[in-house]
From Swiss-Prot:
Keywords: ATP-binding, Ligase, Magnesium, Metal-binding, NAD, Nucleotide-binding. Mg(2+) binds at residues 51, 154. This is NH(3)-dependent NAD(+) synthetase. It comes from Halobacterium salinarum (strain ATCC 700922 / JCM 11081 / NRC-1) (Halobacterium halobium). Homodimer.
């Protein structure tokens, strides 16, 4: 399933020179992070989506295939196509990878707490946190660093599991809007079917990012760039982007409600 075509309210793509500079900066960041940690390699969860695929390409391009260990971690709600895509990415790049089923871990929880078995959010977040545990188990055993796959749109809207998919050592594409991730992915040679695939966290059945967030990523990017990062008032943002004010409010509310995810745990 591909992401629906949308007309972006704002073009945030880089110029050719800016794209080359940003790609070089990210790849140098990956190299420097690994060196600073004194690590031997990187560990990356592969979902078959654009974000993890882009990070995989960046890492292999900079450090070589031997420096990256991929983990494909399917669960009961994972689409077969996504898992096949994840394995295809690993094989195309020539990296070592393992497939680890996460349901046996999650089932241990629902067996002990059966009343929670029907709680989509609790079980879905447990899936994300289980993947984080597996990432770090492999990284600790192999003297590696865990690479994150989060982008700026996800970070600023809180569209991730706390201590789950953002439990990582670094986020190579963390300062890129989703539109920019797509642009970088194409520049890296990521297959077009992965670039245009509808994003999903696959925390529960038939979940899509746009369906859960209520706004498509191009619009989220635009509101974040103009209103949250740019500081333009909400009403002026709606006028500038020619979108309904309620859309700006939705993105602003997502940003506000997720501030706790972007902060260290409070202490008295």
């Amino acid at each position: 399933m591909s992401a629906p075509d949308t007309v972006s309210p704002l073009d945030l793509r880089f110029s050719a020179a800016e794209l080359a500079e940003r790609r070089d900066r990210i790849q140098s960041f990956i190299r420097d992070t690994v060196a600073a940690a004194g690590a031997e390699r990187c560990v990356l969860g592969l979902s078959g989506g654009i974000d993890s695929t882009t990070v995989a390409h960046l890492t292999v391009d900079e450090l070589g295939a031997d420096a990256l260990h991929g983990l494909v971690m399917p669960g009961a709600v994972s689409r077969d196509q996504n898992m096949s895509d994840a394995e295809r990415v690993a094989e195309d790049l020539g990296i070592e990878y393992d497939v680890v089923e996460i349901d046996p871990f999650v089932t241990q929880l629902t067996d002990v707490f059966p009343d929670a078995a029907g709680d989509e959010v609790a079980v879905g977040n447990a899936r994300a946190r289980t993947r984080a545990v597996i990432n770090y188990f492999v990284a600790n055993h192999g003297d590696g660093v865990v690479l994150g796959t989060g982008n700026r749109a996800e970070a600023m809207t809180g569209y991730y599991t706390k201590y789950g998919d953002q439990a990582v050592d670094c986020n190579p594409i963390g300062n890129l809007y989703k539109m920019q991730v797509r642009q970088l992915a194409r520049d890296l040679g990521v297959p077009e079917d992965l670039v245009t695939k509808a994003p999903t966290a696959e925390l529960w059945a038939d979940q899509t990012d746009a369906g859960e967030l209520g706004v498509d990523y191009d619009t989220i990017d635009a509101v974040l760039a103009v209103h949250v990062d740019g500081g333009l008032p909400a009403s002026a943002t709606a006028t500038h982007l020619d979108i309904d004010p309620s859309v700006v409010e939705t993105v602003r509310d997502l940003y506000g409600a997720s501030k706790h995810k972007r902060a260290m745990p409070p202490a008295p």
